[in-house]
Amino acid sequence: MREQGIHFVGTGVSGGEEGARFGPSIMPGGSPEAWESVRPVFQAIAAKTDDGEPCCDWVGNDGAGHFVKMVHNGIEYGDMQLICEAYQFMKDGLGMSADEIHTVFAAWNKTELDSYLIEITADIFAYKDDDGVPMVEKILDTAGQKGTGKWTAINALDHGIPLTLISDAVFARCLAALKPERVAAESHFAITPQKVNGDKQE
């Protein structure tokens, strides 16, 4: 196809609904010859940094754009697992309420931990059902996956790259999906979470 003047551009896109409205992060790869043709359009529609730089640049040949997007998603798997473990520690270890945990996450979002995931997690903890019970306590405790975290972990294994955080996050999702097995195991090995002696403010 290249000999015929037809060039391939494989582009990872990230941003969800907010990205669709206000501009996504764009990760183009493929035929270098095509970059100058698509650059003006891609960088015009991409999200911008605080200093106006577009969140879009050429990342490499062939499938590099989608590879970067895959790794980006893998990193998010790790981030979400850390959020889950922080929530469980606060709830079961420190005995904090959903409102208290919301306050912590909202404060974190004003620091170097500021991120989209921290922001929406804080909002989730604040959301109440019609009966006033925090919605987070009613959500089914299972998690699915689309495969990008698994692909990232497999690539890390294939290349001998230590990536334990993301790999463990993938396994945590596998475990979360096994709801019947977890319920059965709990009946045999029921253990009450131990409280932690600690300062909630810390």
Task: Show where each model-derived region lies.
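Short acidic alpha-helix initiation/capping motifs at coil-to-helix transition points
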Residues: 78-81, 143-150
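Conserved short loop/turn motifs at secondary-structure junctions
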Residues: 107, 139-142
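Domain-level signal for soluble alpha/beta catalytic cores
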Residues: 154-157
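Glycine-rich anion/phosphate-binding loop at the beta-strand->alpha-helix junction
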Residues: 166
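C-terminal catalytic subdomain
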Residues: 201-202
